[in-house]
Structures are given as structure tokens and as C-alpha cells.
Amino acid sequence: MYIKHSKSTLFISKSKILNEIPILFLHGFTGSTKSWLSIRSKISSPSISIDIPGHGKSTFNNLNESYFFKDFSNELYISLLQMKIKKINLCGYSLGGRLAITFAAKYPDMINSLLIESTSLGIEDRIDREIRYKKDLNISESIEENLTEFTKNWSFNKLFEKQELRNKEGTLDQKTVRKSHNKEQLARSLKTFSIGNMPFLRNQFQKFTFPIIIVNGKDDIEYIKEGRDMLKLNKNAMQYIINNASHNVHLESEESFLDILSDLYN
């Protein structure tokens, strides 16, 4: 289904029956609702997945209009109200994790639990944020110049280097998703949702009163540290570190990720 908002049009995939609190999945950069298909097909809980603007079938209505993290939070909130959903178990991976934290900070009463995979609270130092934003602007230009070349190079990112060994079929599906995007929309998404554009959310995270589940792959040293830093901030948080996985745990170690979901929601 599609829901058109003032600044974006969101594509939403949902279970036919939402008779209990659903798990809402948010994918990472270059992903889509298809990134969660395998996980969603193997859980008993009702679920929802959304294409983040600029990805898959979700679009920015005007590529030249300003759009911020808060705009996505507001549009997601309105979408949930239209679907008559009052509570969610929110699960976000990487970029989707940052959007999940941002949404939870603005609409905490909507959150039953928060599962964040390989993500962070943003960048604290203003100068470091500016440096990162400039880097992402350069990447967005490369997307607009040649999406095929960008997706090929993106697959060689050290965060993803063992994915094909661990889940060949899932990795091939992921490559297909990456190639399917509209290059102007994807480039705009990176400009919009760059971590350099994101507010630093440490203070908000400290105030969360719902269960927080932090998931990291054992090979992803940088994000294990991010997870441990978050763990120290909130007594409601717990961290899972998964063997034989790096950045994308739900793809590289699907059974372990499903075990976590089963422990939490069954």
C-alpha cells in the first residue's frame, strides 16, 4: 500500500491481519522492504516494513524540497495512525536504526520495544558531523553519475566483505535490490539521512523507558563499541553480539537473528 504525505510517498508492506502489536522493520541504506522478506516470512508475529524515502517504491515528492529526520518521524507517525496502530515493536538496521531511534525519541508512547541493529546515536562533535556530511555528499554525486558502478563498489565495503560466504542467496537478492533504485531518489536519500545531518540523540536515548535490544555482529568492532556505549546510557538496554556476523546480522546470521526475535516476541 502507498500513503502520500506532504513531502514523501511511503510504500508500506504489512501483514494481512494486525491482531497484536506488530514488529515494524526499517531497512538500511540501499535496502528496501524486500530486505526483510526472509525474516518476516519466518516469524509468527504480525509485521510491517516500509521503504525509506528514496528507496524502493517510496519517493520524495519534490527532490528540491527540504526533508529532515523529523519529517520521516512525522510521516511514519501519521501512517501508523491511518492504519489504526497505536503501538509497535520497532526494529531498525543501520540507517533504519538511526531513523528508529529518532522516531522513538519523538513518539515514545508509540514504542513497545526498540531493537536496533548495527547503528548509533549520531555524531556528537559538530565539526565531525560536517566532515561526514561532505563525504556523503561526494558519495551521493557518485550515485547520480553511475548507479551501477556505485552499487558494485558499495558491495566491496569492508562491512560487507563476508556476506556472500555466509548467505549467498541473500547477498545476491540484496545486490538486485541495490540495482533497482532510482539514482536521483537514492542520492537524495543519502543527502537527507546522512549521519552528518542527524541530531545527536544521547540525551533522548537515556530517557527511554521501554526495552531496548542492541544487536551487533562479532566482526563489526566499530559498532560493537557504539552498542556498548549505548548500553551504558540506559538500564533498559541489553546487547547481543552474534558470532559469524559483521554489520548486517539479519542477513549474515539469520537464524541467530530469528532466535532473538523469538525470545523477545513469542
Regions found by a protein language model. Give the residues of each.
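N-terminal cap/lid segment of alpha/beta-hydrolase-fold proteins
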Residues: 1-9
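Conserved HGGG/HGGXW glycine-rich cap/lid loop of the alpha/beta-hydrolase fold
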Residues: 8-60
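Active-site loop/oxyanion-hole signature of alpha/beta-hydrolase fold enzymes
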Residues: 37, 48-91, 259
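Gly/Ala-rich beta-loop-alpha elbow adjacent to hydrolase catalytic centers
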Residues: 92-96, 100
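Conserved serine/cysteine hydrolase catalytic core
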Residues: 179-228
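Catalytic histidine neighborhood in serine/cysteine hydrolases
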Residues: 228-248
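Catalytic histidine-centered segment of alpha/beta-hydrolase-like enzymes
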Residues: 245-254, 258
